[in-house]
Swiss-Prot record:
Residues 1-22 are annotated as: Disordered. It holds the Pfam family AIRS_C. This is Phosphoribosylformylglycinamidine cyclo-ligase. Pathway: Purine metabolism; IMP biosynthesis via de novo pathway; 5-amino-1-(5-phospho-D-ribosyl)imidazole from N(2)-formyl-N(1)-(5-phospho-D-ribosyl)glycinamide: step 2/2. GO terms for molecular function: ATP binding; phosphoribosylamine-glycine ligase activity; phosphoribosylformylglycinamidine cyclo-ligase activity. It comes from Mesorhizobium japonicum (strain LMG 29417 / CECT 9101 / MAFF 303099). Belongs to the AIR synthase family.
Amino acid sequence: MSKRDTSQPKTGQPKTSKRRNGLTYAEAGVDIDAGNLMVEKIKPLVRATRRPGADGEIGGFGGLFDLKAAGFTDPVLVAANDGVGTKLKIAIDAGKHDTIGIDLVAMCVNDIVVQGAEPLFFLDYFATGKLDPDQGAAIVGGIAEGCRQAGCALIGGETAEMPGMYHGNDYDLAGFAVGAAERGQLLPTDDIVEGDVLLGLASSGLHSNGFSLVRRIVAASGLAWSDPAPFNDEATLAEALLEPTRIYVKSILKAIRNTHGIKALAHITGGGFPENIPRVLPKDFSAELDLEAIDVPPVFSWLAKTGGVAPEEMMRTFNCGVGMILAVASGQAAQVAAVLQEAGETVTPIGRIVPRRDAGVIYRGSIGL
């Protein structure tokens, strides 16, 4: 992992310079010692993400990755970057920072695996107005956990302490992931046909989209983040809403390699079904979804009823219980589903590919909100 630069504001003076009887960098709001302490705290977390191709230590100016050592012969690189959106605000307000990093990794690596690529390494950007080493270590701990779940190495990061740029305890995160696939093995394939089956993989909850609407609904409900969740007897409202985004990488890669039946994958993020599924389909085909086959988790029903959100708006904003959709050859759907279930996924047939009509997604039945 490359060395984290923990003091970002640039001045005409070296970072550690001090004029006689003058101000110091710490007095200006940037604590280099706090940054160094955070680096020490995260070193073991970073080491735990090592994998073939990445075994560097913290301290370099850049992270290294050896594609040959990772087993690739003629790879095509696939890159993705993303953030967590205003889900961060709930983590900040609730003081719960240990899982938001999982979301950051998930949003990037799930976008890589849908192209048939294996995520290889990850870098993060963490910006705050006042660095708290323990908080920072908790955040990076979540990032490291996400990397372990995805099988990718955390090889670099940036911690930016920027006084005056963020209010109070606010911070922001951005993630960058790079993966690879052998040339000729990228998805979607060019043989999608009418009758191909659509399989849905269950989400873990809201994942990381729609949280500006979520926060608006919670504010109108009068509930506090520490109150029991109305839709979950075992968690506070904050804990339930902060359930980390599911990382589908290992199960999907296993299904791709063991069945060769997956033709396309759609990560259901912002825009929901109508915006994400058509992105991976040829222009002469549509996805026909059987909405009554979808098992909608209680959190979505609560949001819809409490906020008075119409079903169409729910499906355009949230995943509604389906975090990933696969287009699979009809004759191999059972085999693909079996491999995914063995890998821990909840798999449901939710539709099929049909000739293109007016819309890229056609709904049948009603969703159970």
